[in-house]
C-alpha cells in the first residue's frame, strides 16, 4: 500500500480529565469481594473502587511458576525511546492514593456474562478469515530468530459504539509474540470497550497474555496470576478519556521491553514503569519475540462472521478521513536484538483487513513519523 504524504499538527496530549459518572452507561453488574492482601480501599466519585494490595500478596504470586519468584522493582536497563510524560490522573486519585509497598487493583466487576476468549491475528502462519466473529485491521512486523526485544506504540483513544453491548467488544492494542499454535506466547496491551467484562462502555486500558495459544493460560489484567505489578499509581483497567471527532485528541503511550538481565518483559505507560510479565511464565518468548502487531479488533457476538454488525472499530470512521476523525497508532517502533529502537518503513509491514468494506487501514506519513490509520463503522 502506497503511503500518502502530508503534514499535520498534533493536538495537546494532556491526559488529566474528569469522566462523567459511569452509571448511565453501565450494564447490570456487581462488585466482587476485595482481594486478599488489601490494606486500603479507595472509592472514586464515579463509583470506581480500587483496593491497595500488599505488593507481595498480589495475584501474580499465586502462579505455580512464581512461588519462589524474586520481585524485581525496576528494569536493569531500557531502550532510549522511553520518555517522560505527565502522569495520568485517575478519578479515584481525588480520594487518595495507594501507599508505597502496595499496588492499586481495580475491584473486579461481575456482570454474569461470559468473557470471550481472545484470538491472535496470526498474519504469518494463518491470516484471519473474513468469516469469523473476530474482525481486524492490523499491521505486523516480522523479525527472524525470535530476537525482538520490545516495541512502542502511541494509540489514539476513542469510545466506539457496540451493536450488542452485552457481548461485543472493540479494542486497539499492540501484540508482541513468538511461537505458533499451542506454543504461541503473547504479550498484549491497549485500550478496549467491553461492557460485558468491565461493566460500562468507557474505553479502558487493558493487558493480556497467554503462554499456550489462548488454550488454558492467560487472562485480562490481573484477573489471574501472571503479570507482576510494581507501580503504586496506575490501576490496570483504568478508564481513559476518549477523543472527540474533529476536536481534542487523546492518546495512550505504551512501551513493552525485555530486560536482558532477567528476561522479564516490562510495561511502561507514559514513560512510567508499571510492572512486568515474568520470563518464567513463558516458553517461546523468553529470549525475544518474532512478531509485533498494531491495530484494531472487534468481536461480533451475534455469530454472523462480522459482516452484519455495526460494532465500530477505532473512531467508527474509515482511515481515509485522517487525523482527528479516524483512529491512529503512531510510534510504530521496535527494539532490535542489540537494544536499538528501529522505525520500520511502511513497506516493511504486512497488513490485513479481511473485511475492508467494514474495517480497513492505511499508512500516512506525518511531518516526522509514520502513522497507521485504521478502523471503520462496521458492516452497515
From Swiss-Prot:
Keywords: Disulfide bond, Glycoprotein, Hydrolase, Protease, Secreted, Signal, Zymogen. It is found in: Secreted. One of its GO terms (biological process) is proteolysis. Glycans are attached at residues 68, 145, 152, 253. Its EC number is 3.4.21.26. The active site is at 188, 297. One of its GO terms (cellular component) is extracellular region. In the proteomics field, can be used for directed protein digestion for mass spectrometric analysis. For example, can be used to study post-translational modifications in the N-terminal tails of histones. In a single digest, efficiently cleaves histones, after 'Pro-32' for histone H4 and after 'Pro-38' in histone H3, which generates the N-terminal tails 1-32 and 1-38, respectively. This generates convenient peptide lengths for retention and dispersion of modified H3 and H4 peptides and allows the simultaneous analysis of co-occurring post-translational modifications in these N-terminal tails. This is Protein neprosin. It comes from Nepenthes x ventrata (Red tropical pitcher plant). The lineage of its organism: Eukaryota, Viridiplantae, Streptophyta, Embryophyta, Tracheophyta.
Amino acid at each position: 500500500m502506497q503511503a500518502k504524504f502530508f503534514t499535520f499538527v498534533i493536538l495537546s496530549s494532556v491526559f488529566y480529565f474528569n469522566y462523567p459518572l459511569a452509571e448511565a452507561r453501565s450494564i447490570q453488574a456487581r462488585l466482587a469481594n476485595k482481594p486478599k492482601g488489601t490494606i486500603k480501599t479507595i472509592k472514586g466519585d464515579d463509583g470506581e473502587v480500587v483496593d491497595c494490595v500488599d505488593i507481595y500478596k498480589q495475584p501474580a504470586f499465586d502462579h505455580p511458576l512464581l512461588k519462589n519468584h524474586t520481585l524485581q522493582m525496576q528494569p536493569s536497563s531500557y531502550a532510549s525511546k522511553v520518555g517522560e510524560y505527565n502522569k495520568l490522573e485517575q478519578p479515584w486519585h481525588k480520594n487518595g492514593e495507594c501507599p508505597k509497598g502496595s499496588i492499586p487493583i481495580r475491584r473486579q466487576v461481575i456482570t454474569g456474562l461470559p468473557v470471550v476468549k481472545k484470538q491472535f491475528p496470526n498474519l504469518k502462519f494463518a491470516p484471519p478469515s473474513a468469516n469469523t466473529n473476530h474482525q481486524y485491521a492490523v499491521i505486523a512486523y516480522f523479525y527472524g530468530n525470535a530476537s525482538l526485544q520490545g516495541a512502542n506504540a502511541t494509540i489514539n483513544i476513542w469510545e466506539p459504539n457496540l451493536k450488542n453491548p452485552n457481548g461485543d467488544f472493540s479494542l486497539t492494542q499492540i501484540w508482541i509474540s513468538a511461537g505458533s499454535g499451542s506454543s504461541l506466547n503473547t504479550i498484549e496491551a491497549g485500550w478496549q470497550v467491553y461492557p460485558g467484562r468491565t461493566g460500562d462502555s468507557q474505553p479502558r486500558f487493558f493487558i493480556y497474555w497467554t503462554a499456550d495459544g489462548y488454550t488454558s493460560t492467560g487472562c485480562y489484567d490481573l484477573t489471574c496470576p501472571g503479570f507482576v505489578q510494581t507501580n503504586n499509581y496506575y490501576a490496570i483497567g483504568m478508564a481513559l478519556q476518549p477523543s472527540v471527532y474533529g476536536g481534542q485528541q487523546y492518546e495512550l503511550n505504551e512501551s513493552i521491553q525485555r530486560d536482558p538481565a532477567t528476561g522479564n518483559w516490562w510495561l511502561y505507560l507514559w514513560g512510567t514503569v508499571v510492572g512486568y510479565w515474568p520470563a518464567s511464565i513463558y516458553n517461546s518468548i523468553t529470549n525475544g519475540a518474532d512478531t509485533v502487531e498494531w491495530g484494531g479488533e472487534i468481536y461480533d457476538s451475534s455469530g454472523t462472521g462480522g459482516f452484519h454488525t455495526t460494532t465500530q472499530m477505532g473512531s467508527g470512521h474509515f482511515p481515509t478521513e485522517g487525523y482527528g476523525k479516524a483512529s491512529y497508532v503512531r510510534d510504530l517502533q521496535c527494539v532490535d536484538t542489540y537494544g536499538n529502537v528501529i522505525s520500520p518503513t511502511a513497506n516493511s509491514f504486512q497488513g490485513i483487513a479481511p473485511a475492508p468494506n467494514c474495517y480497513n487501514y492505511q499508512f500516512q506519513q506525518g511531518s516526522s513519523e509514520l502513522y497507521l490509520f485504521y478502523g471503520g463503522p462496521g458492516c452497515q
